[in-house]
UniProtKB/Swiss-Prot annotation:
Belongs to the metallo-dependent hydrolases superfamily. Urease alpha subunit family. The active site is at residue 322. This is Urease subunit alpha. Its cofactor is Ni cation. The modification N6-carboxylysine is found at residue 219. It is found in: Cytoplasm. It comes from the Bacteria. NCBIfam families: PRK13207.1, urease_alph.
Amino acid sequence: MAQINRKLYSSMYGITTGDIVTLGDTNLKIQVEKDYTTYGEECVFGGGKVIRDGMGQASGFCDEEVLDMVITNALIIDYKGIYKADIGIKNGKIKGIGKAGNPHIQPGVSPTLIIGTITEVVSGEGRILTAGAIDTHVHYISPQQADEALASGITTFVGGGTGPATGTYATTCTPGWYLRKMMEATDNIPINFGFLGKGNSSKSKALEGQIKAGALGLKLHEDWGSTPSVIDTSLKVADEYDVQICIHTDSINECGYIEDTLCAIDGRTIHAYHVEGAGGGHAPDIMKACEYANILPSSTTPTNPYSLNTIDEHLDMLMVCHHLDFNNPEDISFAQSRIRQQTIGAEDFLHDMGAISIFTSDSQAMGRIGEVICRTWQIASRMKEIRGFLSEDQMTGNDNYRVRRYIAKYTINAALAHGLSHIVGSVEKGKLADLVLWRPEFFGTKPDIVIKGGMIAYAQMGDPNASIPTPEPYISRPMYGAFGNAASATSCLFISEASIEAIKGYGLNKMLTVVKGCRVISKNDLKLNNYMPCIDIDSKTFEVSIDGVLISVKPAKKLPLAQLYNLF
C-alpha cells in the first residue's frame, strides 16, 4: 500500500488514530482512539474525488437500501468514545456508523452504509461531530430562544412556561390549558420539545390532569411552595405515570431544611435543579444533594465557571427573575442568601469530579441558553488548569476521559434523566439524527452545521447574494430544515404515555414520542458523572469541604471560548 504522511492525510481525509486535536482555545486535547474507515478507501466528495457513480457511489440498489445522507470521515466525540467514522442517515435517523461507500468495489463497507444515487453528502473531514445538546432547564419566555439555541448546537428543550408571564420568568411550568396552546405554538419550531406541568399541589387531581394533557413531567418550585406535602404528592403521581419530577427547593428553609426535603423525597427518583452555588434551593447546603443515588443533580450557566464577574451580576439578575423589590429589605436579604462565592467556587469542582451530572441553561431566568455548551467547556478547561489531568487521563497524556465526562452532561445524562435516551442524547444507531458539526478551532462556540432529524436546520452561511457560500458576513443562519412543515416533521414532542390519545386530537405535526423509564433511573445510571462524595458546608462561613478537603479557589480572570470568539 502507498504511504502518505499524517499532515497530508489529515488535510485530505481528516485525522486518524493517534492524532491529537485541541478544542478551541481551551487547554483540552483529545486523541483519536480508533478509525472505523478503511485506509485507501476513504469516501470524499468533489471533482475528481471518490463519491462518483461506479466508484464510491453504488448503482443497482433500491432506495430503501441506500442512505439519504452520509457524513464522511468525521471525528465523533460522544460519551462512549472519541473516534473517526462515516455516519449514515436514513429517514431522519442514524442508520449506521462505520465505513460507508460502494460494497461492489470497496472492502469493509457496512451493509447499512451504502452510498447510492439518492445519497446527499456532508463532508466531515477536519470536522468534529457531536450529538445535539439537550437543555433540561428552559424557561419558555420567548420563542426567539430557539434561534439562539440552534445556533449554539442545542436541539432539544425540556422546560416550561407560557411566554413573558411573571410566573414563567421565575419557574419552568406550563400549567393546565397552556399545555396544548404551547404545543401548538411550538409545533413548527425545529427543536424537540418537552413540557413540564406545574407540580406544586398537595392534592393529585390537577397533577394527573396535566400529565394526561401531555406534560412529560412536573416541576416543583419554591416560588409556588415546595413543601414536604407537595413533594410527596407529586412523586406519588410521577410513580404512577412514569414521568420525572424536577425540583427547585426552598432557599429560605421556610418549609424545612434539606433534611426535611430528603425525608419527603423518601428515596424516590427526582431531578434536582440548582444543585449549585447561587441558583436557589436550600441555603447554604443544597449541594449535599449530590451525595444521594436517587437524586439526579444539575446546575445552570449563571454560576459556571466561577469568574471575576460572577458575583456582581447575580443580584440584579435574581431580583428581576423572581419578582423582588430593591426597596424591600426582606427581598434583598432573600436574594443575598442565595449568592455565596464559596459554594459557587465549589460547584466547578463537583462538575469536574462527576458529582453534578447534568448542565443546563436556566434560560432568561438568570441563565443564557446559547452558553450551555461553551460554558461546559470553559469549566472543563478551568478545572484542568487548577486540578491537572484527571486520574483516568494521566497515563494517556490526553483529556479524552474528561471530555467524555463533560459532553455527557448536556447529552446522554440529560436524556436519561427525562426518559428520552431511546431517541436522543448520543451518536448511536437508531437514534434521531440530531447532529452537530464543528471546526475544531470553533468547538463549543460556533457550530458549522446543525442537523435536525436528518435535515440541515442551521449553518454558518455567508452573504446570500454572494457568488459562493462563504463571503462575509459569515454567520449562523436558519436553513431549509428550519422552515415549513420540515421543521415539525424532523422534530419530536416528548409526552407522557397517558397523554397519547388526547394529543392525537391536537392536530400537531411533530413526532409524538413517549418518555420511558423515568422512575427507575438513578444517579448510578448517569454516564461518567455518578460520583457521590461527602460534602460539608459550614452554615456560617459557607466554606465547602468535599471528601474532607476544603475547597478554596480564586475566581478566573480569563476564560477560553469567550470574547475572542465574538469580535465579529
